Each structure stands twice: as structure tokens, then as C-alpha cells.
Amino acid sequence: MGKARGVNSGGGESSLGYLFGSGESVPKPNKPNAKTGFTTTTTTTTTTDGAGGRPKTTTTTTTTGDKNKTEENSAGVRGSPNNYYRSDGQNCGNFLTERPSTKVHAAPGGGSSLGYLFGSGPCGSDK
């Protein structure tokens, strides 16, 4: 008979235990508490409206802190000193590589630039 399902045929220990559940607990790294210069205070007050006797809730949120601290970027937003304004958009020009553009320069059905490959002259001419 063949092997039962899930039976290993030998070899070294799998490094995929994290994926398939090796039974060992992975220690989590200790993260220091994030310290910010801001404090947020929320106050909720409930009063009774005199006209209809309905409860009226007022919530006040106050944020205090040091506004002179360096601005922090959101997650995924990279602050770079090389971030300059490009008038044509971010993907124009060869600012990443010195390779030529792959932009199509001829209309469909127009003159072919593959004459060097097939040994023919310009489109429509007979040699």
C-alpha cells in the first residue's frame, strides 16, 4: 500500500513550520510603546433638553501637543529629498533609466520599422 496522506518521506526539518503550524510558538519581538507629543482627551456630557425632556449628548475632543515636532508621514508615504515637481507627470522622461522610450511612434498600418529584419525596403516599395 502507499503512504498515508500527510506523511513525510524523510529529509530535513521543514522551514515552513510557520505556515503549516509546527507546534512551536514563535516569540514576538518587543515593540517599544510609541511616544508622541500629542494628547487627546474626549469628554461626553449628557443633559436633558427642557423643551421635550429628551436627552441631549455633547461630545468634545481636545488634542494638545507640541506642534513644533517634525511631521510624521502616513504609513506607505515616503518622504524623500528627491521628490521634485515634474510638470509632465511622474512617469515622464528618463529619470529612472537611460533606456529609450518604448512609446509607439507610428500609427497602426503605417510604415514598418522592421525592414532591416526582413530585408525589404520601405512599405509599398518593390526592389
From Swiss-Prot:
Q: Where are the transmembrane segments?
A: none
Q: Where is this region: Disordered?
A: 1-127
Q: Where is the composition biased (Low complexity)?
A: 39-48
User: Where is this chain compositionally biased, Polar residues type?
Assistant: 80-94
Q: Which domain of life is it from?
A: Eukaryota
Q: In which tissues is it expressed?
A: Ubiquitous.
Name the GO cellular-component terms. microtubule
Q: Which GO terms describe its biological process?
A: cortical microtubule organization
Question: Which residues does the record list as Phosphoserine (modified residue)?
Answer: S80
Matches recorded under InterPro entries: SPR1/2/3/4/5
Q: Which UniProt keywords apply?
A: Microtubule, Phosphoprotein
The record ties this protein, via PANTHER family, to:
PROTEIN SPIRAL1-LIKE 4 (PTHR33403:SF17), SPR1 (PTHR33403)
The similarity annotation says: Belongs to the SPIRAL1 family.
Function, in words:
Acts redundantly with SPR1 in maintaining the cortical microtubules organization essential for anisotropic cell growth.
The protein's name: Protein SPIRAL1-like 4
